[in-house]
C-alpha cells in the first residue's frame, strides 16, 4: 500500500486533543509502537483501506507531511523518510510532528485545513467504561509519568527537539478535566447522526494541482470563492418536503479521474448533483471515449440508505430503502380505510361545494375531501394527452429541479431532461427518483395550463396580497400603495409532481400547516393519513427527532393512520395539519399546490410551532418551510385585517355579528405577532429580515388600538340597557301609582323648576319636537235591549303618513353609505323619531334640501365618532377662494362740445 493511501488526513485533532492523546505515550520515545489512548478507551490510529464498494478516502501528499516539519527549529528524533510508510509508525509520527508544530509555532497556516469537513470523516469509536477503577488507574499513571514529563525539558535546554511536547497544565485535576472534555466530544461525534453521511468523501489533490475543467481555482481558492458567492446571493429555500444536503458545498469538492489522474471540481466534472456519490471509478469526459462510462458502486446493502457500504450489511432495515419498499408494497393494503368523519368522498365539484358549505365552509374545514370528477371545481388542468415531455418542452430541458433519491431518502438537483430519460427507461431502474417541487408560476405558458380550484384562489392569503397583475385587484393595490414586490411572494400554489413506480415519500406535515389540492393527471397515488390531533403531533415530533430510521410512523401511531387511494382524474383536498405519507404504485404525473387561509389559521400556527420545535431539536437548517411565513402574516394584518377592524369601529358595529371569522383570525394573529415581536426585541432581527423592526412595531401599535376599540364596542353591547332610558318613564310611573308620595327633595326640585320657569318667562322659548300623535276615534256602541251596562269605549288607531321632517330624515339615511358601500348604522333616536317610516325606506325626494352634502358628511362623521368613543375633531371649513374682480375699462373721455359763447370767451382771453 502506498503511503499516500493512508487515511491520516481525516484524523486531525485540535491542539489540546493532540497533546492530551500524546500524554499517554510510552516514556521511551525511541519506541514508536506504543499504543495511543488511555485506560478504558481505545483509538484506531490508522484506518484500513476501504473496500472497492466504498467511497475513495482523501489522500495525503508528502507536502502535507512536510508542511508542519518546516516550522521546527530542531531536528526531529526520527526522520519520516527513514520510516516504513506501510506501518502504523508513520501515522503516529505524523500526529507527533503536528503536535510539535502546534506547541512551538501555533497552528501552521496550511490551506488544506480550511476545507476540512469533520462531518465527512470516519468516526473515531471510543470504547469507554465508566468504572472508577479505570479512572483511578488513569490518575495513577499520570502521576507516575510526571517525572518523565519534566525530563523532556532537557531536550530544550540541550538545543534538541523532543519527540513530542505537552500542553502546559497547572495540575493533574485540570488535566483530567481536559481529557474528559475530549472524551465527551468524541462521544458526541459518534452519537450524532450526520446529514452528510452519504456525501462522497473528499479527495485531496496536491497544492500544485488545478481543476481540469475550469483551471482557475486551487484548493484554497475554492472556499474563498464559495464564501464570496454566499455573500452576494441569499440562499433560497429548497423546494422539497424532505431534508436536503448542502449541495453548494459539494460543488467545489474534488474528484479525480481514475484514468488520467486529473483533478476536477464536482461542478466542472460533468456530473450532476445526484451522481456525486454514485461512482466507484470516475472517468472524466476526455477519457470516456477510450475507457467507457464511469463505474457505479455495487449494491451491497439494499436495506440501507448507504446501499453501497459493506459496513452496513448487518444493520436494520431503514424506512424508504429498497428492501423496505418492496416489503411494504406487499402488506400496505392492510392499513385500515378512513371513516366518514375523516374523509368525505363526493362525485364532483358541485357536490363538494354543497357538502363543504354544509360543514361550515373554509372557516370550519377539518375533513379531507376526495372529488372523483373535477367538474364543478372551476379548476384548470391540461388537456388529455399532456405528458412529461410537454413539461420538459415548456420549462426547458436544462431546467434543474430538486429531485428525491428514493432509496437514499435525500434530495439532489437534477435536470428535467435527465429525469425524463430515467423516467422513460422502465426496464433499467437501479434507483428510483421523483420530484415534488417543480413550481411553475413564473412560467407564463405553464401557469395558464394548470390553475388551482376557484375556491382556493378566493380564500388564499397569498392570492389576496399578491393578486394577478392582469386583474382589477392588482390595480386597486397600486392605487392604495399596498402592492408588495413579486420576489417576496411565496410561490407554492402551482406545483408539478412526477414519480416513478415504487417511489415512497415518508410522513410529513405540509410546511406552515398549509392546505393542499392534489389532482392526478396520470397514474395513481396512495395516501396514508393521520388526523391533526395533539396525540398524533406528539408521536410525530418524537418520530422526527429520533435518530432511529427503522421504525414506520404508522406502527407507533396506535391505529391513527388510514389509507386513501386516488386514481387518475381524481382530486384530493387536504386541510391544515394532516400528517401523511405517499406511495406511488405506478408512474404518475400530478398537479397540485399549497395555500394558507384564515379558516385554518389556528392549526397553521400550531404546525408552525411544531416545525420550529423539530428544527430546534435536530438543529437542521435545511428543512423546507413555507417561504416568508411571518412576513406574509405581518402584511396580511396590515393590509387586510386592520382595515376591516378599523372600518367596523368607524361604523360602531360588532364584528362578532357580521364578520366573526375576521375577528377570530385577528385575535389569533395578534397573539402570535406579539410573540414574534417579543422574540425580535430580545434576540434581535433575523438575518436577511425583509420588514424592519420599526415597521412591525408601528403595525402592532395600530392593531392594539383598533382591537381595544372593538372590544369596547362589544362590551357596551353586552351590558343591559342603561338607567337613563328607565328614568324617562319615571313621571308616568309616578302618576300611575296612587300611593306614591314624593320626598322632600323631589318636591323641592319640582318647586324650584316651576319657579325657574316663571322667572325665565322673558327668555326665548324653544319648541320641542312633538312625538307623533295618532288620533283616536271613538265609535259608539249600540245599547243592548236588556238592562244598561257600563262599557269601555272602543278606540281605533289610524296610521298617518310621514311628516315632511320624517321624509327628509329617511331620505338622508337611505342615501348615506360608508367608503365600503355599507348602509350607515342608524342612531336609536333617529329610529325612534321616524318610527316605521324609516323601516319602510320610502324613496321620496324632499322638495327642498334641508342641508348641504358637506353638512351631512360632517354630521355623519360626528355620529360615528360618538359611537366609537373618539374625540370629535373640529375642522374649520375652508373658505372659498375669493374670485378676483374684473377690472372695468374706463371709456375714453368724451370731447366737450364748445358752444358759441365758449368760443367767444376763448378769443377774448387770447
UniProtKB/Swiss-Prot annotation:
GO biological process: chromatin remodeling; mitochondrial unfolded protein response; regulation of transcription by RNA polymerase II
Residue ranges of domain JmjC in the record: 441-612
Compositional bias per record (Polar residues), positions renumbered to this chain: 1-11, 43-58, 150-160
Cofactors named for this entry: Fe(2+)
Its EC number(s): 1.14.11.-
Variant or mutagenesis effect after changing residue 261 to A: Abolishes binding to H3K4me3
Effect of residue 263 to A: Abolishes binding to H3K4me3
Record flagged with keyword Cell cycle: no
Result of changing residue 437 to A: Abolishes histone methyltransferase activity
Gene inactivation effect: Impaired locomotion. While wild-type animals move by alternating dorsal and ventral flexions along the body length, producing a regular sinusoidal track on bacteria, the track pattern left by mutants is irregular, with increased wavelength (distance between successive peaks of a wave) but unchanged amplitude of the wave. An increase of H3K9me2 and H3K27me2 levels is observed. RNAi-mediated knockdown suppresses mitochondrial stress-mediated longevity.
The keyword Nucleus belongs to this UniProt entry's keyword annotation: yes
Basic residues composition-biased segments: 748-757
Tissues in which the UniProt entry reports expression: Mainly expressed in neurons. Also weakly expressed in some muscle, intestinal and hypodermal cells.
Region (Disordered): 1-58, 103-162, 183-212, 712-790, 864-910
UniProt entry keywords in alphabetical sequence: Chromatin regulator, Dioxygenase, Iron, Metal-binding, Nucleus, Oxidoreductase, Transcription, Transcription regulation, Zinc, Zinc-finger
Effect in UniProt of substituting residue 209 to A: Abolishes binding to H3K4me3
Matches recorded under PROSITE patterns: JMJC (PS51184), ZF_PHD_1 (PS01359)
Function per UniProt: Histone demethylase required for nervous system development. Specifically demethylates dimethylated 'Lys-9', 'Lys-23' and 'Lys-27' (H3K9me2, H3K23me2 and H3K27me2, respectively) of histone H3, thereby playing a central role in histone code. Promotes mitochondrial stress-induced longevity.
Domain notes: The PHD-type zinc finger mediates binding to H3K4me3.
Protein name: Lysine-specific demethylase 7 homolog
Organism of this sequence: Caenorhabditis elegans
Lineage start: Eukaryota, Metazoa, Ecdysozoa, Nematoda, Chromadorea
Amino acid at each position: 500500500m502506498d503511503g499516500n493511501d493512508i487515511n491520516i488526513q481525516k484524523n486531525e485533532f485540535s491542539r489540546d486533543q493532540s497533546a492530551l492523546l500524546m500524554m499517554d505515550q510510552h516514556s521511551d520515545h525511541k519506541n514508536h509502537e506504543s499504543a495511543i489512548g488511555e485506560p478504558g478507551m481505545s483509538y484506531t490510529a490508522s484506518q484500513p483501506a476501504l473496500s472497492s464498494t466504498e467511497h475513495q478516502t482523501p489522500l495525503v501528499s508528502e507536502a502535507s507531511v512536510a508542511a508542519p516539519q518546516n516550522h521546527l527549529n530542531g531536528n526531529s528524533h526520527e526522520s519520516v523518510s527513514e520510516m516504513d510508510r506501510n506501518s502504523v509508525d508513520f501515522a503516529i509520527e505524523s500526529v507527533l510532528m503536528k503536535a510539535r508544530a502546534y506547541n512551538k509555532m501555533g497552528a501552521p497556516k496550511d490551506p488544506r485545513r480550511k476545507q476540512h469537513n469533520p462531518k465527512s470523516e470516519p468516526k473515531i469509536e471510543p470504547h469507554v467504561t465508566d468504572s472508577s477503577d479505570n479512572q483511578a488507574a488513569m490518575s495513577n499513571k499520570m502521576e507516575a509519568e510526571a517525572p518523565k514529563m519534566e525530563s523532556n525539558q532537557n531536550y530544550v535546554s540541550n538545543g534538541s527537539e523532543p519527540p513530542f511536547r505537552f500542553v502546559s497544565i497547572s495540575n493533574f485535576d485540570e488535566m483530567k478535566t481536559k481529557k474528559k472534555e475530549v472524551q465527551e466530544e468524541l462521544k458526541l461525534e459518534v452519537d450524532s447522526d450526520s446529514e452528510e453521511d452519504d456525501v462522497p468523501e473528499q479527495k485531496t489533490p496536491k497544492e500544485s494541482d488545478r481543476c481540469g475543467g475550469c483551471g482557475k481555482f486551487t484548493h484554497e481558492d475554492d472556499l474563498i470563492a464559495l464564501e464570496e458567492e454566499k455573500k452576494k446571493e441569499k440562499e433560497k429555500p429548497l423546494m422539497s418536503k424532505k431534508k436536503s444536503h448542502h449541495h453548494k458545498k459539494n460543488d467545489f469538492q474534488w474528484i479525480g479521474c481514475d484514468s488520467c489522474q486529473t483533478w476536477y471540481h464536482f461542478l466542472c466534472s460533468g456530473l450532476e448533483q445526484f451522481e456525486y456519490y454514485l461512482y466507484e471509478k470516475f472517468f472524466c469526459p476526455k477519457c470516456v471515449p477510450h475507457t467507457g462510462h464511469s463505474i457505479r458502486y455495487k449494491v451491497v446493502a439494499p436495506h440501507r440508505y448507504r446501499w453501497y457500504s459493506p459496513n452496513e450489511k448487518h444493520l436494520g432495515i431503514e424506512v424508504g430503502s429498497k428492501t423496505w419498499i418492496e416489503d411494504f408494497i406487499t402488506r400496505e393494503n392492510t392499513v385500515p380505510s378512513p371513516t366518514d368523519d375523516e374523509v368525505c368522498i363526493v362525485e364532483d365539484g358541485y357536490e363538494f361545494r354543497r357538502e363543504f358549505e354544509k360543514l361550515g365552509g373554509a372557516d370550519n374545514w377539518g375533513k379531507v375531501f376526495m372529488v372523483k370528477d373535477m367538474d364543478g371545481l372551476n379548476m384548470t388542468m391540461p388537456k388529455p394527452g399532456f405528458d412529461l415531455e410537454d413539461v420538459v418542452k415548456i420549462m426547458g430541458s436544462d431546467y434543474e429541479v430538486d429531485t428525491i433519491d428514493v432509496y437514499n431518502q435525500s434530495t439532489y438537483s437534477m435536470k428535467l431532461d435527465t429525469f425524463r430519460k430515467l423516467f422513460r427507461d422502465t426496464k433499467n431502474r437501479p434507483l428510483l427518483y421523483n420530484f415534488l417541487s417543480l413550481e411553475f408560476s413564473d412560467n407564463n405558458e405553464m401557469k395558464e395550463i394548470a390553475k388551482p380550484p376557484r375556491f382556493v384562489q378566493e380564500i388564499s392569503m397569498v392570492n389576496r396580497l399578491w393578486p394577478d397583475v392582469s386583474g382589477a385587484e392588482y390595480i386597486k393595490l397600486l392605487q392604495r400603495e399596498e402592492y408588495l414586490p413579486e420576489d417576496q411572494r411565496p410561490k407554492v400554489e402551482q406545483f408539478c409532481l412526477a414519480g416513478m413506480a415504487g417511489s415512497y415519500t415518508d410522513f410529513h406535515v405540509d410546511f406552515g400547516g398549509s392546505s393542499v389540492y392534489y389532482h392526478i393527471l396520470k397514474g395513481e397515488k396512495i395516501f396514508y393519513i393521520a388526523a391533526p390531533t395533539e396525540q398524533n403531533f406528539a408521536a410525530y415530533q418524537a418520530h422526527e427527532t429520533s435518530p432511529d430510521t427503522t421504525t414506520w410512523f404508522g406502527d407507533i401511531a396506535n391505529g391513527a393512520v388510514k389509507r386513501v387511494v386516488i386514481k387518475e382524474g381524481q382530486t384530493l383536498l387536504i386541510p391544515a395539519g394532516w400528517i401523511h405519507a405517499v406511495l406511488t404504485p405506478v408512474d404518475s404525473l400530478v398537479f397540485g399546490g399549497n395555500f394558507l387561509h384564515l379558516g385554518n389559521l389556528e392549526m397553521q400556527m400550531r404546525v408552525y410551532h411544531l416545525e420550529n420545535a423539530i428544527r430546534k431539536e435536530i438543529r437542521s437548517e435545511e428543512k423546507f418551510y413555507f417561504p416568508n411565513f411571518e412576513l406574509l402574516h405581518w402584511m396580511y394584518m396590515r393590509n387586510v385585517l386592520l382595515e376591516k377592524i378599523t372600518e367596523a369601529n368607524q361604523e360602531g358595529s360588532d364584528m362578532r355579528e357580521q364578520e366573526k371569522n375576521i375577528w377570530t383570525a385577528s385575535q389569533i394573529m395578534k397573539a402570535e405577532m406579539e410573540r414574534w415581536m417579543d422574540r425580535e426585541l430580545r434576540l434581535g432581527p433575523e438575518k436577511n429580515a425583509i420588514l424592519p423592526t420599526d415597521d412591525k412595531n408601528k403595525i402592532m401599535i395600530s392593531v392594539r388600538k383598533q382591537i381595544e376599540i372593538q372590544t369596547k364596542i362589544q362590551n357596551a353591547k353586552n351590558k343591559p340597557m342603561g338607567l337613563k332610558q328607565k328614568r324617562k318613564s319615571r313621571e308616568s310611573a309616578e302618576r300611575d301609582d296612587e300611593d306614591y308620595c314624593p320626598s322632600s327633595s323631589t318636591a323641592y326640585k319640582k318647586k324650584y323648576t316651576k319657579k325657574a320657569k316663571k322667572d325665565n318667562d322673558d327668555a326665548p322659548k324653544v319648541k320641542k319636537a312633538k312625538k307623533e300623535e295618532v288620533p283616536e276615534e271613538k265609535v259608539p256602541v249600540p245599547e243592548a235591549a236588556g238592562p244598561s251596562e257600563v262599557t269601555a269605549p272602543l278606540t281605533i288607531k289610524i296610521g298617518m303618513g310621514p311628516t315632511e321632517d320624517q321624509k327628509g330624515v329617511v331620505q338622508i339615511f337611505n342615501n348615506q353609505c360608508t367608503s365600503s358601500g355599507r348602509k350607515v348604522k342608524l342612531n336609536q333616536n333617529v329610529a325612534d323619531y321616524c318610527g316605521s317610516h324609516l323601516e319602510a325606506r320610502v324613496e321620496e325626494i324632499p322638495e327642498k334640501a334641508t342641508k348641504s352634502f358637506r353638512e351631512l358628511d360632517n354630521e355623519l362623521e360626528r355620529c360615528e365618532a360618538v359611537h366609537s368613543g373618539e374625540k370629535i375633531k373640529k375642522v374649520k371649513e375652508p373658505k372659498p377662494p375669493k374670485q378676483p374682480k374684473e377690472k372695468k375699462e374706463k371709456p375714453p373721455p368724451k370731447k366737450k362740445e364748445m358752444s358759441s359763447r365758449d368760443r367767444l370767451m376763448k378769443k377774448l382771453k387770447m
